[in-house]
């Protein structure tokens, strides 16, 4: 769905969260090394990868969750009414599903591993301003990429070493 649809959905979900004294999780995904993949294997393969990732997201979320292609190789999923640790585990399930796929590239007769990084923030916990929550999810995503990619990071976990994040992931 496009940006206008996304902005309307964000507005609706924020109103719902405020009225129902609930939370809204923002999961921001970015396919790791997408530009390199696109440059190496071509735009048709890049488009297939984006479509595959969209389908993986849809398989891993609830009907009430809202997935949006945010731009380029970035996707956002809005998840209402869930504890942030559970929302993180949804992000991790999506991450693992993509990692398990080996993208078949017919012209090269090879399968390519592709990974994704994810940042998570929550309204109204991280901010009562949804634009700031989205920015914080983006900051967590940026941190995930900076520590080696292929990991999900909650905004509160920024600055935690990767080893500690991986330990907490295994315990979940």
Per-region residue spans from a language model:
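Conserved long alpha-helical elements within nucleotide-processing catalytic cores of c-di-GMP signaling
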Residues: 2-25, 35-59, 68-72, 76-77, ...
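Active-site core of bacterial EAL-family cyclic-dinucleotide phosphodiesterase domains
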Residues: 27, 168-172
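GGDEF/GGEEF active-site signature
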Residues: 52-132, 143, 154, 171-172
